[in-house]
Amino acid sequence: MITLGHMLALGAVLFAISLAGIFLNRKNVIVLLMSIELMLLSVNVNFVAFSRQLGDPSGQLFVFFILTVAAAEAAIGLAILVTLFRTRRTINVGEVDSLKG
């Protein structure tokens, strides 16, 4: 049987993997976006786990709102990435310094 501890451990492992992805690979925009999405997924796992434990469906409802925001974030991030690649011919974050004043 899957307990609350198992679900929280899974959420913690996913969150740690996403943090490692963000801190170890800061130059590739695609890896950064994937790590942020994985971080949101780990939060969703924790919401569902607590919602199941407490018998309250509001946590599961909140997951749908998070998924909606995550989908919008991914769409906007990929649109920025495509525009960046078309103008600079790179997706390396270190080479994009056009906003520096």
Swiss-Prot record:
Disulfide bonds: none annotated. Keywords: Cell inner membrane, Cell membrane, Membrane, NAD, Quinone, Translocase, Transmembrane, Transmembrane helix, Transport, Ubiquinone. It is found in: Cell inner membrane. One of its GO terms (cellular component) is plasma membrane. GO terms for molecular function: NADH:ubiquinone reductase (non-electrogenic) activity; quinone binding. It is an enzyme of class 7 (translocase). GO terms for biological process: ATP synthesis coupled electron transport. Pfam families: Oxidored_q2. Its EC number is 7.1.1.-. The chain crosses the membrane at residues 4-24, 30-50, 62-82. It comes from the Bacteria. It is a multi-pass membrane protein. It catalyses: a quinone + NADH + 5 H(+)(in) = a quinol + NAD(+) + 4 H(+)(out). NDH-1 is composed of 14 different subunits. Subunits NuoA, H, J, K, L, M, N constitute the membrane sector of the complex. NDH-1 shuttles electrons from NADH, via FMN and iron-sulfur (Fe-S) centers, to quinones in the respiratory chain. The immediate electron acceptor for the enzyme in this species is believed to be ubiquinone. Couples the redox reaction to proton translocation (for every two electrons transferred, four hydrogen ions are translocated across the cytoplasmic membrane), and thus conserves the redox energy in a proton gradient. Belongs to the complex I subunit 4L family. This is NADH-quinone oxidoreductase subunit K. It comes from Stenotrophomonas maltophilia (strain R551-3).
